[in-house]
Structure formats: structure tokens, C-alpha cells
């Protein structure tokens, strides 16, 4: 029987983390699909809901970019889709014309509130029943 080295244990732990992540993301996608959202869409809505609790509050896209695992261009496209669906509103930052503000619409807040329990239930189920090795 081969003796596990520190490197092989790290590899095994890493693969376990990736496996839990993949299963969790697939399950989140599955439960959100009937609501017209995917896991990345939800993450952006969730960040906006946390960062902009009051109606009319805005968040810089740059601040969202630092918290999601998407390229700047992928995030821009995702926000464009959310805007087209009426879930967010974009505007140019007056202080820095290169910056873009994004805000949840009422429709976006309502959808986020509706699907939040679904996403949290998936996290509770997958992260407590499948710990990384």
C-alpha cells in the first residue's frame, strides 16, 4: 500500500473542495433555473442586495468584480442580461466617467428575496453533508 505524502493529501483535499464546489454550483443552477437565474446571476443579485440595502442605493461594478469569480467582460455581459431582464439598472459614475454604477430594481429585489431561501438551502445541504476531505 502506498504511503500518502503531504503533496498527495493536499491534492486529495483540493479535489474534494473542487468536487463540493462543482456539485453546489450545479445544484444552485438547477434550483434557480425555473426563476430564470443561474448561480452567477444570483451572486451578483446577492452582492447588490447586501451592498445596497435601501431603495436607490448603488454599487460600483468594480466593487462587484472583486467579489465574483468572473472576468470583467463576463461580469459586464451578465449585468447587461440582468438589466435587459429589468432586475438591475446601470448608470455612469459622474465623478469618474470610466466607472459604472449598478442598482437593484424593485423587480430585482423581489426576485432576490424569492430565491434567497432556495440558494441558502442548497448551501446548507451541500456544505454540511459534503465536507472537504
Enumerate the predicted regions with their spans.
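N-terminal leader segment of winged-helix/HTH proteins
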Residues: 1-35, 85-87
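C-terminal regulatory/oligomerization modules of transcriptional regulators
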Residues: 1-9, 55, 117, 130-133
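A cross-family signal for key residues in well-ordered alpha-helices
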Residues: 18, 46, 113
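Charged, amphipathic alpha-helical coiled-coil/dimerization segments
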Residues: 25, 80-133
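N-terminal helix-turn-helix DNA-binding core of bacterial DNA-binding proteins
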Residues: 26-71
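Short, hydrophobic-biased segments on the C-terminal half of alpha helices
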Residues: 61, 79-80
Amino acid at each position: 500500500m502506498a504511503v500518502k505524502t503531504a503533496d498527495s493529501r493536499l491534492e486529495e483535499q483540493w479535489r474534494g473542495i473542487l468536487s463540493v464546489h462543482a456539485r453546489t454550483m450545479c445544484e444552485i443552477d438547477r434550483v434557480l433555473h425555473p426563476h430564470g437565474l443561474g448561480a452567477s446571476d444570483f451572486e451578483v443579485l446577492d452582492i447588490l442586495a447586501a451592498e445596497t440595502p435601501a431603495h436607490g442605493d448603488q454599487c460600483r461594478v468594480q466593487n462587484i468584480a472583486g467579489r465574483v469569480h468572473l472576468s470583467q467582460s463576463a461580469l459586464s455581459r451578465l449585468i447587461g442580461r440582468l438589466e435587459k431582464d429589468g432586475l438591475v439598472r446601470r448608470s455612469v459614475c459622474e465623478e469618474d466617467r470610466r466607472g459604472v454604477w449598478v442598482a437593484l430594481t424593485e423587480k430585482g429585489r423581489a426576485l432576490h428575496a424569492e430565491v434567497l431561501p432556495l440558494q441558502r438551502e442548497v448551501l446548507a445541504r451541500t456544505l454540511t453533508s459534503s465536507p472537504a476531505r
